[in-house]
């Protein structure tokens, strides 16, 4: 049966757009902004450390930023109510 794998998005900034094809071997290339010269690549969380190390060694990569999606609170129902009660308790 199909197993869902944990994945993480990486924003990879490039020096030149022509080097985008070199990074497609590391994961699924989701978006390429030619104007701002960055890519969004999704890779498996298991391979994160090794692939980051390999990508940072490339001369075409300027910067790599992992996605903060896991750190964001995604419980939207009742968010305003929770914020109001926290502010009243502090003040």
UniProtKB/Swiss-Prot annotation:
Intracellular or extracellular location(s): Cytoplasm
Coiled coil: none
Keywords: Cytoplasm
Taxonomy, superkingdom: Bacteria
GO CC list: cytoplasm
InterPro entries registered for this protein in UniProt: DUF2129
Entry similarity comment: Belongs to the UPF0298 family.
Name this protein carries in UniProt: UPF0298 protein SPy_0397/M5005_Spy0329
Organism field: Streptococcus pyogenes serotype M1
């Amino acid at each position: 049966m199909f197993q869902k794998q944990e994945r993480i998005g990486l924003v990879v900034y490039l020096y030149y757009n022509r080097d985008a094809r070199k990074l497609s071997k590391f994961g699924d290339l989701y978006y390429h902004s030619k104007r701002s010269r960055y890519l969004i690549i999704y890779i498996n969380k298991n391979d994160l450390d090794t692939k980051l190390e390999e990508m940072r060694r490339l001369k075409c990569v300027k910067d790599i930023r992992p996605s903060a999606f896991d750190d964001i609170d995604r419980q939207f129902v009742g968010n305003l109510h929770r914020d109001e009660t926290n502010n009243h308790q502090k003040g």
